[in-house]
Amino acid sequence: MELIVYIIAVFGLAAFVYFVRNKKAHYIAAILFCCVQLTLNYLIIVDRNVFLEYFFKSDALSIIFISILTITGITTIINSFVYFENRKDNYFRRGIYLASLFVLFACMTGVFLSDNINILWILAEATTLCISLLIYHDRNEEALEATWKYFF
């Protein structure tokens, strides 16, 4: 149940930052995403059997990886906002970037918790698509070329 709430929250925040083009809303959504990720991390550390779903299971290694992902994710989001402030990027590109970043972290969390090889493969491919959106968020010719080079 907790994983379903996490997925709904992350995809809801990703849709929010994509459709709402406001600087303050992006900050609030990023803070909420960090809180959701920290809450999931806390639940996994406190109760290892929090996920009783068929396809997902937490073990010691997944706890370590999700903790590292949470720390990396929070620092990435902070660094992204510093980068956007220095660059004076528009809110459309920022929304695409943040939505892709939120979904990327959700997919990586799913990869670490996956107990089924098919789900693992689907989520690993979803991370590839999210990373390609992160590469192409500038929407210029160089970004397009880099995205195609990433795929092939």
Residue map of PLM features:
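Transmembrane helix-loop-helix hairpins at membrane boundaries of multipass inner-membrane proteins
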Residues: 1-99
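Alpha-helical multi-pass transmembrane bundles of energy-transducing inner-membrane proteins
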Residues: 96-103, 107-152
